[in-house]
Structure formats: C-alpha cells, structure tokens
C-alpha cells in the first residue's frame, strides 16, 4: 500500500515537473531562444572587417559555444541561481539579499543600492530593444521567403508590436497557455534545422575545442574584439533565467535549459556554421537560408510567434520590475491592475505599457533593420550582468560566508568574461548603443530623484512629528465627541500622529468610535506569509495600531489587512461604515538643504502626478477622505 502511494506521489511529482518545464520554456527562454535569428548573421557583418574563411567560421562558432557554456550554463544556471531570495530571483531580489548584513546608514549600503537600481534600470533599455529586434528580425525572413513582400516588413512589424501592447490591458493568461507548446515547437524546429545542416559538414564540431576561439582572437586582434560584441547576442536573455526563478523554481529552469533549450540552440548554431562552410553565400542571413525553400514561409510565421512570446516575457518583466520598485520606494505609486485571478504575478501597469509602446515603435522606425538594432543591443544587458556578478560576490562573502580566496577566484573568473563582453559592447555606443544607455540612465536618474525626495519628505515630517501614544493618551483624557463607524488612518510611520488625524480633529472635532492606524512596511524578502503579516496592538477605547508587512513583490491590500487583523480588532469592518483618512502631501521646493532646486521641482512634479493613494490601495473613492498638507523640502 505504502509503495503504491509512493509511486503515485512520484508520478504526480514528475507530471508537475514536466508541466513546470514546459511553462518555463514558454516564458523564460523566449529572448535567448530567438537569438539564432540574428546572432551569427551579425557576427559576420562586413563592418567588422573579418575576411570570410573556414578558420573564421570555426573561431566564431567556438566563441559562441564557450560563451553559452561559461555565462549561461556555469554562471547563471549553476551558480547565480543559487542566490535566491526566499525562492525569488532577479537583480532587485539579489540587491535585497546583499543588503541583509549591511548597516542601514553605511556607504556600502548606499553603493549596493545604487548598483542594484542601476542594473534594474538597464533592463528598461533591454525591454525596448528586445521586442523591436526580435519581431523585426523574424519579419525580415519575408525578404527571402516572399521577396515581393519586402516593402511591407516594417509596417507588418509595427502592426504586430502595436497589437501586442494593445492586448496587455485584458491580460494574456488565455493565450499564455499556448506559449509553452509554441516554444517547444520552435526549439524542435531549431534543433531539426541544425541537425540537417550539421550532417552536411560535421567537421564544424571541432569548434567545441576552445583552441579555435583563441586562435581567432589572436589572429584578428581588434577585429575579433569587435566581433565579441556580436557574439554576446547569443547570451541576451540569460538574465531572464535568474529573474523568472520565482515563477517556476530553479529545477524546472535548469532542466529546461540543459535538456531542451541548450541542445536546440547549439545544434542550430553549429548547423548554421556547417552551412556557411558548404555555402559561404548564405552569410547574408544564415538562419533563413538554412530553411528549405518550401518551409521558409511557415518558418517566418513560427518565428513571428516565438518573437512575440519573447517580447511578452520582457513586457511582463517590465511590469513586475516596476511593481517591485514601487514597493521598495524607488518609483512613485502607479495604477496597477491584476489581469488574472489565478496568477497574482500577472499585472498590468498602464503608464509603463504606453511608454514602452511609444519607444519600441519609435526604435523600429528609426533603426529600420535588425542589423542596425543589433548595434544598440547588448550594452544594457552586459551592464546588468557585470552588476549581477558584483552583487553575487557580496552575497557569497557576507551571506553565505564563503572563504575570501574562493569568493575572489569565482567572482574574478566570471568578472573577466563579463568585462570582456562589456568592453566589446562599449564599441557599439556610437552606432546605437547610446540609446539603451541613455534610456537606462534617464530612468536611473528619475528613480534616484524620487528615492532622495521621499527621504527628504520623511525627514521633514519627522522633524515636526508628534509621538502617537502620548498624543492619544492626552486626547482620551479630554476626548472629543465620538461618532459611529470606523476610521482607518493610513500612515507611513506608526510611531507618529498621522497628519490626517490632526486635520480631522482640527476641522471636524470628532473621533470615530473605532479608530485603526495602519502602517505598511516593505521587507527585503519577496513575499510575507499571511500568518506573519499583521501585528495588532490595542491602545484602548476602541483604538488599534496595526503594522502590516509586505514583500517587495507584493502590493498592499488594505481590506486583506483588516480581515487578518479582525480577531484582535473585533467585529468586521463594514465598508459602508468605514472611512479611510489619507494625507495628501503637497511638496514645496525650497532652499533648505537637500537637492538642487530643479531636482526638487522634478520630484514635486513626480509626486503630484503619481497615483492617488486611494487608487493604489484600491479603496472606493466615496469612502476616502483626503486631507492636504504642505511639506517643504
């Protein structure tokens, strides 16, 4: 009997693992999985000045192979994915993990925070380039499959991208179920095409020997260094393996990489290389030239589907990253909509969606060809990869307590490779690499302005703050008129009197029969268990102090907090008998120490245009009382 139960449990576990692997293949590997469309073609770009030869083909294929082995398989899949923050991955999760042992006021804390935020900002540059280059390179297959449609490549690309962003509002949970199967077909097609071409010139397999990569670098020196920036295109999307770890877990992602994705990609790259050895004229577009003529149009359709899926993963990542940044205090509150009742991670951020739409379409129209976009691609990703290595080194030493010598050896080994790719990509700045850097830098500046501005607002508020408990004691000694119902005061600091309470007492001169103060605290972990979320302290006379803790991947829910606190608070808070009091701060730039005047004005503008607290906390407008207050910074 027990053996039967064990067998059943094992079988169910295997089924779940397979389902998770398929799901991961559909979401995690979209970006890196569509790189064969343009990576090898860009490596042989005439602008690099590398004369076509058998040695060049073997050298470049060897570099592609070892780049994937070292950066993706060793660094990300086997090493970085160990640095999970309660199961969550991504650069902000890694930053939060690295800060656990840092002094809150130390320079180390500030430096690690800035590094993590800057790395996250670079993702926004990637989020603009990825959809543009992926869909455009897929549609360029029409130039080979149906030359008469060549003039329509750009318009079709724009239409596909516009449609992709327009459907975000309704959510993608329904079509999302097709992502895994479609990407499985895509990787199967990559593997099959690669295998067919590989059999025509199996001698390409000698490129697994790193001697060919070293010889290529030695022979061509500076030109080979330039090519290294194009070789990096096979690695774009590697960061997603770590970033999406919280959705699928490390094991399904590792299985998906080693047993499906990596073999398919390597077969395709080696197949493209074999085809170049047999027919050098195919260098203009090795991917589509490797496809039999009768299958070229179906392959364009499949490639379009795969690139849309890759783009969707990046767009969803931008929504998720924005939500995390809001919780960590780096971004003003924005309206966030949940597009699925089953999946809490499926969210829609309107402001981010429309900004990405405008930028992506603008990039496609400005660069026009995937070759031109390839020059802009990579530098943002390499920046994030370098920062990931640095933060991982901090985690190794301060959290895992590894031996300093081992930390140095491991981190330096990865850092040498990262810096080689980063340096090679710096050469692309003039040809378009400036765009993602400029975009990421602008986002970083805005985020740091908001973060610094919020610190100043908190500091000014604390200067004039009144300790809550002595104030309540004095208030209850000479109580104002008590009225029926419940008043909920949202406050940033549970130890001080909310400005909204002071204004309510000043103007209305009443106190509700039940008063609840709620303060939200964001922890350095992604999720907080409901059992540990709410702490309630009864002050007496119907007054309660509630502290609600949330992870940086969660969005505060006032109603849920009231439900969790009900056993201590008493009777249920009925919506129609509850008023929510919120202080609406009006920021006034001044000559007080803090930021320069123009940055203070920028912060004031961001503050004014952020989502109202009632919208962010999803409180019905007719139950909210907003009381204004001015804060000089």
Curated annotation (Swiss-Prot):
One of its GO terms (molecular function) is symporter activity. It catalyses: K(+)(in) + H(+)(in) = K(+)(out) + H(+)(out). Its main location: membrane. It is a multi-pass membrane protein. It is found in: Cell inner membrane. It comes from the Bacteria. Keywords: Cell inner membrane, Cell membrane, Ion transport, Membrane, Potassium, Potassium transport, Symport, Transmembrane, Transmembrane helix, Transport. GO terms for cellular component: plasma membrane. The chain crosses the membrane at residues 20-40, 52-72, 109-129, 147-167, 178-198, 221-241, 257-277, 299-319, 347-367, 376-396, 404-424, 431-451. Pfam families: K_trans, K_trans_C. Transport of potassium into the cell. Likely operates as a K(+):H(+) symporter. PANTHER family: LOW AFFINITY POTASSIUM TRANSPORT SYSTEM PROTEIN KUP, OSMOTIC STRESS POTASSIUM TRANSPORTER. Belongs to the HAK/KUP transporter (TC 2.A.72) family. This is Probable potassium transport system protein Kup 2. It comes from Ralstonia nicotianae (strain ATCC BAA-1114 / GMI1000). The lineage of its organism: Bacteria, Pseudomonadati, Pseudomonadota, Betaproteobacteria, Burkholderiales. The gene is kup2.
């Amino acid at each position: 009997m027990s053996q039967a139960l064990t067998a059943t449990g094992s079988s169910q576990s295997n089924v779940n693992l397979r389902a998770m692997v398929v799901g991961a293949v559909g979401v995690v590997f979209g970006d890196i999985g569509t790189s064969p469309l343009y990576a090898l073609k860009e490596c042989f770009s005439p602008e690099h000045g590398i004369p076509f030869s058998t040695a060049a083909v073997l050298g470049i294929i060897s570099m592609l192979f070892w780049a994937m082995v070292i950066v993706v398989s060793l660094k990300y899949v086997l090493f970085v994915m160990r640095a999970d923050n309660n199961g969550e991955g991504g650069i902000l999760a890694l930053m939060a993990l690295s800060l656990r042992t840092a002094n809150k006021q130390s320079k180390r804390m500030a430096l690690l925070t800035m590094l993590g935020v800057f790395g996250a900002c670079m993702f926004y540059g990637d989020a603009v380039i990825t959809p543009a280059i992926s869909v455009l390179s897929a549609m360029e297959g029409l130039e080979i499959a149906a030359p008469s449609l060549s003039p329509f490549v750009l318009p079709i690309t724009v239409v596909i991208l516009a449609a992709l962003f327009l459907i975000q509002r309704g959510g993608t949970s329904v079509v999302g179920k097709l992502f895994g199967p479609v990407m499985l077909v895509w990787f199967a097609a990559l593997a099959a095409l690669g295998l067919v071409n590989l059999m025509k010139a199996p001698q390409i397999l000698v490129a697994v020997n790193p001697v060919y990569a070293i010889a290529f670098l030695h022979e061509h020196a500076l030109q080979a260094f330039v090519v290294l920036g194009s070789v990096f295109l096979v690695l774009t999307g590697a960061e997603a393996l770590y970033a999406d770890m919280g959705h699928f877990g490390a094991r399904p992602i590792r299985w998906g990489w080693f047993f499906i994705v990596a073999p398919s990609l390597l077969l395709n790259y080696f197949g493209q290389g074999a085809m170049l050895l047999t027919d050098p004229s195919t260098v203009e577009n090795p991917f589509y030239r490797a496809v039999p003529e009768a299958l070229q149009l179906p392959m364009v359709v499949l490639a379009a589907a795969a690139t849309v899926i890759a783009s969707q993963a990046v767009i969803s990542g931008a929504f998720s990253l924005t939500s995390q940044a809001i919780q960590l205090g780096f971004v003003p509150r924005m309206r966030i909509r949940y597009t699925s009742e089953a999946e809490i991670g499926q969210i829609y951020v309107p402001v981010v969606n429309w900004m990405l739409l405008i930028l992506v379409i603008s990039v496609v129209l400005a660069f026009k060809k995937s070759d031109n976009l390839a020059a802009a691609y990579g530098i943002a990703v390499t920046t994030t990869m370098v920062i990931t290595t640095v933060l991982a080194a901090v985690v190794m030493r301060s959290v895992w307590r590894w031996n300093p010598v081992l930390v140095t050896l491991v981190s330096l080994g990865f850092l040498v490779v990262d810096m080689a790719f980063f340096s090679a990509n710096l050469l692309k700045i003039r040809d378009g690499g400036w765009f993602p850097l400029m975009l990421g830098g602008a986002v970083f500046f805005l985020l740091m302005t908001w973060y610094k501005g919020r610190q100043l607002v908190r500091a000014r508020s604390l200067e004039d703050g009144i300790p809550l408990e002595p104030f309540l004691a004095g208030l209850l000694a000479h109580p104002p008129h008590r009225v029926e119902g419940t008043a909920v005061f949202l406050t940033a600091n549970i130890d001080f009197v909310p400005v909204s309470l002071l204004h309510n007492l000043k103007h209305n001169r009443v106190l509700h029969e039940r008063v609840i103060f709620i303060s939200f605290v964001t922890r350095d972990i992604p999720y907080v268990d409901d059992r540990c979320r709410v702490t309630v302290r009864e002050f007496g006379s119907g007054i309660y102090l509630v502290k609600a803790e949330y992870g940086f991947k969660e969005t505060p829910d006032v109603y849920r907090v009231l439900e969790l606190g009900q056993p201590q608070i008493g009777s249920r808070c009925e919506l129609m008998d509850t008023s929510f009091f919120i202080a609406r701060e009006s920021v006034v730039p001044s000559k007080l120490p803090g930021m320069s005047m123009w940055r203070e004005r920028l912060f004031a503008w961001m503050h004014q245009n952020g989502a109202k607290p009632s919208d962010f906390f999803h409180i019905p407008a007719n139950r909210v009382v907003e009381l204004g207050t001015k804060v000089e910074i």
